Amino acid sequence: MTTNLLDQMNTLVPMVVEQSNKGERAYDIYSRLLKERIIFLVGPINDNVASLVTAQLLFLESEDPKKEINLYINSPGGLVTAGLGIYDTMQYIKPDVSTLCIGQAASMGSFLLAAGKKGKRFSLPNSRIMVHQPSAGFQGQATDIEIHANEVLALKKRLNEIYSKHTGKSVDDVKKALERDNFMTPDTAKEFGLIDEVVENRS
């Protein structure tokens, strides 16, 4: 995300004012929703975003290790290593993490969507979900390119195994599904095992 875009987002974030017996207190909307144990993962997944999401997960665990956390995802994907950092934290902490796709969950976005607690992975009906294999470009000496290519293959293998674990599909089925950009409707994603339910309204 460019600095200009971040600045625009910061200026557009609404503030919420709450009244209490101690007076008024203003929160930005995301901080207020964090009090309700809602974390937003919006935009490309990079190291900065991963750091923020991870910190919020750990904070909410420290607040109440038994209470569910809700992760709302609207992301085109991003860095595999950053996504794996969020994934590992989701699996590490004690609270269940419920995931909800709003808009899109592509690439590492879909990976994190599937990583929610089984039975608590959701999508809104008009969202778009996309899976594919990791990609990378290299420059340099042939030996270095070979090293990086082998690392990408190792990451691909690991991601396939994790998708298999969370979807219930065989690794071979996952490989086939991820061979190219594979766009899914929420209903198709449910059939594949990426999510558990398509939700239209709060029940």
From Swiss-Prot:
Principal cellular location given in the protein's record: cytoplasm
Function (record text): Cleaves peptides in various proteins in a process that requires ATP hydrolysis. Has a chymotrypsin-like activity. Plays a major role in the degradation of misfolded proteins.
Organism this protein belongs to: Pelagibacter ubique (strain HTCC1062)
Name by which UniProt lists this protein: ATP-dependent Clp protease proteolytic subunit
Primary enzyme class: hydrolase
Keyword Hydrolase attached: yes
Pfam family, one: CLP_protease
Entries under CDD domains matching the protein: S14_ClpP_2
Membership in a protein family: Belongs to the peptidase S14 family.
Record has Zinc-finger as a keyword: no
GO annotation, biological process: protein quality control for misfolded or incompletely synthesized proteins
Catalysed conversion reaction: Hydrolysis of proteins to small peptides in the presence of ATP and magnesium. alpha-casein is the usual test substrate. In the absence of ATP, only oligopeptides shorter than five residues are hydrolyzed (such as succinyl-Leu-Tyr-|-NHMec, and Leu-Tyr-Leu-|-Tyr-Trp, in which cleavage of the -Tyr-|-Leu- and -Tyr-|-Trp bonds also occurs)
Sorted UniProt keywords: Cytoplasm, Hydrolase, Protease, Serine protease
Protein localization: Cytoplasm
Catalytic residues, chain numbering: S107 (nucleophile), H132
Subunit structure: Fourteen ClpP subunits assemble into 2 heptameric rings which stack back to back to give a disk-like structure with a central cavity, resembling the structure of eukaryotic proteasomes.
One Gene Ontology MF term: ATPase binding
EC number(s) on file: 3.4.21.92
Gene3D superfamilies: 2-enoyl-CoA Hydratase, Chain A, domain 1 (3.90.226.10)
GO CC annotation: cytoplasm; endopeptidase Clp complex
